[in-house]
Amino acid sequence: MKLELIWVIYKSGSKSAKEEALLCSRNIESLGIKVITAESGPLLNTCNNILNPNKQIPTLVIVLGGDGTVLGAARHLAMYEVPILSFNVGGNLGFLTHDRQLLKDESLWSRIQEDQFAIESRMMLKGRVESYLDTNDVGKKENFFWALNDIYFRSCSEDISPTCTLELKIDDEDVDIYRGDGVILSTPTGSTAYSMATGGPILHPGIEAIIVSAICPMSLSSRPIVVPAGSRLIIKPVGNKNQRVNIWQDGVSSALMQKGEQCVIEKARNHAQMLILEQSPSYFRTLTQKLHWAGSLVDNQNKMAPK
């Protein structure tokens, strides 16, 4: 990979991420590579701020933070399909990030320049809110948003119990009506996030599909389902005419929806390009390490066993 311009995006409000970003930038500049550094938060679209004055697409984006920082970068960069290399600095679980100690590896940049890495192309979701009550007004009010992990729907009423009633259509076919705390539509990448907490399945990122999971449904028959990635899903609030539903993209509030409106969710045209420093990465090894499955426990026991 020929490195001409690198963005270093770090987690907003994290002292350690900022310090690591400054050090990383100095190391990149010492190689004669142009670098731009900026912070990123849930409501801060750093990418647009950097692109507007420069109009130059980076060769590589370095993200320093947790999975939330990576998700934000992926949403804003997907249309450019720029490789994202992320490190867990000031973050939590870090399913999408590398260990920050790898930043100290003197061979890091030469490995990247010599293409000693793998690229994982991750499916994303695209959603839009539209009005459907007046056939002449369908699609007139539109609010587009993207997600790498998930798009989910929850009640935003403050004066009543936070339950909502949502209707699901798949490819124009009525499928179910969910009454409960909400509904999650997840990608394979997001299958180890909020969707997993609701009892949804874990999908290998090499599979392109959409998981539909109810959040605390008031029915034992409401089970998670997996549908083809090419499906067109529609979620709309039904029942109480005063009900308002908050739409969240990767854990960030993105839009409000009320009766008479619906959200259409489909597979996004572009993918998030995740750079993996292992040339033969193992998704299952990541699962055992991050979720502390038996495989990682056995490895630890073997390491501690007397020789």
Curated annotation (Swiss-Prot):
Pfam families: NAD_kinase, NAD_kinase_C
Cell compartment(s), UniProt: Cytoplasm
Listed EC numbers: 2.7.1.23
A GO biological process held by the record: NADP biosynthetic process
InterPro entries: ATP-NAD_kinase_N, ATP-NAD_kinase_PpnK-typ_C, NAD/diacylglycerol_kinase_sf, NADK
Enzyme class name: transferase
Reaction equation(s) it catalyzes: NAD(+) + ATP = ADP + NADP(+) + H(+)
Keywords: ATP-binding, Cytoplasm, Kinase, NAD, NADP, Nucleotide-binding, Transferase
A Gene Ontology molecular function term of the record: metal ion binding
Any one GO cellular component localisation term in the record: cytoplasm
Amino-acid positions noted as binding NAD(+) in the UniProt annotation, renumbered to this chain: 67-68, 149-150, 179, 181
Active-site residue list: 67 (proton acceptor)
Gene3D superfamilies hit by this protein: Probable inorganic polyphosphate/atp-NAD kinase, domain 1, Probable inorganic polyphosphate/atp-NAD kinase, domain 2
Major subcellular site: cytoplasm
Cofactor: a divalent metal cation
Similarity-based family: Belongs to the NAD kinase family.
Role description: Involved in the regulation of the intracellular balance of NAD and NADP, and is a key enzyme in the biosynthesis of NADP. Catalyzes specifically the phosphorylation on 2'-hydroxyl of the adenosine moiety of NAD to yield NADP.
Protein name as catalogued: NAD kinase 1
Phylogenetic placement of the source organism: Bacteria, Bacillati, Cyanobacteriota, Cyanophyceae, Synechococcales
